[in-house]
From Swiss-Prot:
Protein name as it appears in the record: Helix-loop-helix protein 30
InterPro entries: bHLH_dom (IPR011598), HLH_DNA-bd_sf (IPR036638)
Region (Disordered): 1-150, 170-214, 240-265
One GO term of the biological process aspect: positive regulation of macroautophagy
Organism, scientific name: Caenorhabditis elegans
Domain bHLH: 263-316
Tissue: Expressed in the intestine and at lower levels in other tissues, including the spermatheca and the vulva. Expressed in cholinergic motor neurons.
Entries under PROSITE patterns matching the protein: BHLH
Length: 524
């Protein structure tokens, strides 16, 4: 015999919906099967409280109601049944029979039910439940001394373990949802149901289709960040959180936690962007500090700027090392020079104590870059003394300075000071003066030939007379005429002036002597 336990469309519990249950008590006394029933409470969908009941002989329907402490259950406002497996109406059948199975469930639960309950077929013509007297909640169970009590306890433990295992699997895979068909047309999700206290739409269960759009819109408002691009939103994760929890605020897929993680990523990206801008600014500043010849030839990007900076720093390091070496050498030379100077003073003091005349100390001669004769200044001497020149003497530093100064005074074409090149002669500003009453005195002009130095024949083309533009025109002009009066200062540098030798040699003897003194010079 088959007893049918049906959860009608208006309630969530299990009740009696078998036509044979409405028979008189006399007919029911002949039917004494043992059955076990599992009751699921609406306010605690994750826990199952199974109660066992036994239809004994000689008991009426009213007695069984009193024994089972039956409590009527109100119908759902939405008109749909919510079970631990979903929100669609589900039928459960307990008992022993030989007909085919009509129950559809997940693969794991289907295998468990087939192993425990066998194949159960509900009757086709069973009328639906229409009264609250046939919808009962079994809160108390009789003593589990019989066979039915032991079987119900084991069934309770197995079903609770299966439900908790499915819940853990669903938590591990938040985005994987599988549709489960019931009756071939209706679908429902494998997501675990959420208590009605956390529902935002006021429904008894958050798995209701009415609450899903609101939850999705709220999650969209919470998840999307103003600084994050649209592609960075994990849509699959968000939909999985909505399908699993809807309005759950304390689960693993909490939108607030996701928003917090997204905000942390945004702050991290902002810090990295600021650091990158700082590095780019420093590289640009470094490129501006490079030498122009280094930065003009190459394309200024980050790599070339850093490479050129490294090369330039190496060059600066080498220069610094070289400068330090030079400074150390200079210090060592200075210390050595001080030691030598102290030693020389000691030796001079020793010679002075011995009565030896100490020669005057002279500085070493200045090295000559170009060895060539230098014209000397005419010394003041008696009229009959012919001024002569000499080579630079190495006898002392004072003589060198005197000779160099004399040479500079002689060869300077811009010297406007009045110089007397010959003794007892007119001043230099009276030479070639316009309107002069008497010609200049050439009594010592014969000595001009003796100004030529002894070794000047071999270096006639290197004489400093070539530096004077007035001497390039005529070899008969003496060196005394190289410095005319300041009246001709502006005209002596003019290239249009051509000097004539006949106008400057009134005395034939002096002219002959001058010619004899300059016969070896070639001014071509």
């Amino acid at each position: 015999m088959i007893r049918q336990l049906n959860s009608p469309g208006g309630g969530g519990g299990l009740g009696l919906n078998n036509p044979r249950a409405q028979q008189p008590p006399g007919a029911q006394q002949q039917q004494q099967p043992q059955q076990a029933q599992q009751q699921f409470y609406d306010d605690e969908p994750y826990q199952a409280n199974a109660s066992q009941f036994r239809f004994g002989a000689g008991k009426s329907m009213e007695q069984r109601r009193e024994t089972g402490n039956l409590i009527p259950i109100a119908q759902r406002s939405m008109g749909s049944t919510s079970t631990p497996f979903g929100s669609a109406p589900t039928q459960s059948y307990f008992g022993g029979g030989s007909s085919g199975a009509a129950l559809s469930s997940p693969r794991k639960m289907q295998q468990t039910h087939q192993m425990l309950f066998g194949n159960i077929q509900p009757p086709r013509g069973s009328p639906p439940s229409d009264g609250s007297d046939k919808i009962h909640r079994f809160g108390e169970s009789p003593t589990p001394g019989g066979v039915g009590g032991v079987f119900g306890t084991e069934l309770d433990d197995l079903i609770i373990d299966e439900l908790m295992g499915m819940e853990d699997d669903q938590r591990m895979r938040p985005g994987a949802t599988r549709p489960m068909t019931i009756g071939g047309e209706k679908t429902m999700s494998m997501a675990r149901p959420i208590p009605g206290a956390s529902s935002r739409a006021g429904s008894g269960h958050s798995g209701s289709p009415i609450t899903i759009p609101n939850a999705m819109s709220n999650n969209f408002r919470q998840v999307v960040s103003s600084s994050a691009p649209t592609s960075s939103i994990d849509i699959e994760k968000m939909i999985g959180a909505v399908s699993n929890g809807g309005g759950n605020s304390g689960g693993d897929n909490d939108p607030e936690d996701y928003y917090r993680d997204r905000r942390k990523k945004d702050i991290h990206n902002m810090i990295e962007r600021r650091r990158r801008y700082n590095i780019n600014d420093r590289i640009k500043e470094l490129g501006q500090m490079l030498p122009k010849n280094t930065s003009e030839d190459m394309k200024l990007n980050k790599g070339t700027i850093l490479k050129a900076s490294c090369d330039y720093i190496r060059v600066l390091q080498k220069d610094r090392e070289q400068a330090m070496k030079t400074q150390q050498q200079q210090k060592s030379l200075e210390s050595t020079a001080h030691k030598y100077a102290d030693r020389v003073k000691e030796l001079e003091e020793m010679l002075a104590r011995q009565g030896v005349q100490v020669p005057p100390s002279h500085l070493p001669p200045i090295p000559k870059v170009i060895e060539r004769p230098i014209k000397q200044e005419i010394d003041e001497s008696p009229p009959n003394h012919t001024p002569t020149g000499s080579f630079v003497s190495s006898s002392g530093f004072l003589s060198e300075v005197t000779n160099n100064t004399a040479a500079m005074q002689i060869t300077s074409p811009n010297d406007s000071r009045p110089n007397n090149f010959m003794n007892n002669s007119a001043p230099s500003d009276s030479f070639f003066s316009v309107g002069s009453a008497s010609p200049p005195d050439y009594r010592t002009s014969s000595g001009t030939a003796s100004w030529k130095l002894p070794g000047s024949n071999a270096f006639s083309d290197l004489m400093m007379d070539d530096l004077n533009p007035m001497m390039n025109g005529d070899p008969l002009i003496s060196s005394a005429g190289a410095h005319p009066s300041p009246h001709f200062h502006s005209s002596q540098m003019s290239p249009d002036i051509h000097w004539d030798a006949s106008g400057f040699s009134p005395d034939p003897i002096n002219t002959q002597q001058s010619n004899s003194g300059h016969y070896h010079m070639d001014f071509s």
